[in-house]
Amino acid sequence: VDFFA
């Protein structure tokens, strides 16, 4: 999971 995308 990429929370900085």
From Swiss-Prot:
It is found in: Secreted. Disulfide bonds: none annotated. Keywords: Amphibian defense peptide, Secreted. Expressed by the skin dorsal glands. GO terms for cellular component: extracellular region. Its main location: secreted. GO terms for biological process: defense response. Shows neither neuropeptide activity nor antibiotic activity. This is Rubellidin-1.1. It comes from Litoria rubella.
